[in-house]
Amino acid sequence: MSAFNLIIGIVPRGSAELLTHAAVEAGAGGGTIMNARGTARPGEETFFGMDIVPEKDMILILAENAKVQPILDAIKALPCLEKPGTGIAFACPAENFTVLGKKK
């Protein structure tokens, strides 16, 4: 069993900095933020007959197992994520990884 988990958060564009700050306050060592697009069902959101693709931020955080639940709890408690369907965060075991680069 791995001693680490990869926490993945998918939230509305602009929320990633708040999420990352909350995660660091809860014990994360940092994270990676990437731009992403949602895949809402076609026709669900339209503007003048064109489908609108929701802009998202995706956050990746590698954390020790003991820190995963406190980090997820801190993310869930953010006021910007209180509305149902705002985003999702989950953790998966991180297996077979290595740190890249030479030690200084």
Question: Residue spans of the language-model regions?
Answer:
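Positively charged, small/polar-rich N-terminal and surface patches that mediate targeting and assembly
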Residues: 1-104
